[in-house]
């Protein structure tokens, strides 16, 4: 995993510059051992995006950690020095995005938005419509938005 990450990162830096690299990752199927996550942390990764529901596995997190993740909107593994954030808004699954946005805003949770490439190809209009709703709502908000 680390070798692949370093190779991809090297090429991305060559093409786009180091400042454009993501500091939060979403690993395939949310798989990553504590050891592997620690190695990525040493490469500059600050955190990881988790599954949209507590029922799904997310990396090495146990039930107590997942409970904190979903009740607080984030989980910080202080020992390892990495953060975990739920992927609250999965564009291809959202039917009522406004309701979920209201919930996140009231709770003051980070707004994490995600979609798969295949979903854009399957229903481009729905995906972009959902993204527009999120961006419009965020632009209307008066609180400061932090980008990772």
What does each of the following model-derived ranges do?
Residues 1-11, 93-100, 125-138:
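Well-ordered, non-membrane alpha-helical segments in soluble/globular domains
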Residues 1, 33, 147-148:
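Helix N-cap and loop-to-helix transition residues
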Residues 11-21, 137-144:
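A structural motif corresponding to the C-terminal end of an alpha-helix
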Residues 46-53, 107, 111-148:
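C-terminal domain-boundary segment and adjacent tail
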Residues 19-112, 125:
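Active-site-adjacent pocket scaffolds in enzyme catalytic domains
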